[in-house]
From Swiss-Prot:
Keywords: Glycoprotein, Proteoglycan, Signal. Glycans are attached at S61, S63, S84, S88, S109. It comes from the Eukaryota. The lineage of its organism: Eukaryota, Metazoa, Ecdysozoa, Nematoda, Chromadorea. It comes from Caenorhabditis elegans. This is Chondroitin proteoglycan 8. The gene is cpg-8. Residues 33-96 are annotated as: Disordered.
């Protein structure tokens, strides 16, 4: 009976993992959003104000995008606004979110001693 329970648990975890993986936004979409926001931030200040007004209208209008895409656009826009306020030394978003993180043993951790 125990092997059947373990098999059922394995199958349910596999199904849940596949469902979660399908909901992740593909890397190409993330890069496209980043390029669009960078191009918009390079334009003049007058058009930036118009772009900001346009994006707030489309965000609330239910443009047919998934909630993950809308949230991603908001995050990228917020990062660009913060970067433009910090000046020339501002950091730029250059990578996509990490989907899986493997545990890494940092120097000194896991040794169990305080020396």
């Amino acid at each position: 009976m125990r092997p059947f329970i373990l098999l059922a648990l394995l199958v349910s975890v596999t199904v849940a993992f596949n469902i979660f993986r399908d909901e992740v936004v593909p890397e190409e979409q993330l890069l496209a959003v980043r390029r669009t926001t960078r191009d918009a931030s390079d334009s003049s200040s007058d058009s930036d104000e118009k772009d900001d007004a346009k994006t707030t209208v489309t965000d609330g209008s239910g443009s047919g995008e998934s909630p993950a895409e809308e949230q991603l656009r908001r995050v990228v826009r917020d990062v660009d606004e913060e970067a433009s306020g910090e000046g020339s030394g501002a950091a730029e978003v250059t990578s996509v979110p990490v989907r899986f993180v493997r545990s890494v043993d940092a120097e000194g951790s896991g040794s169990g001693s305080d020396e």
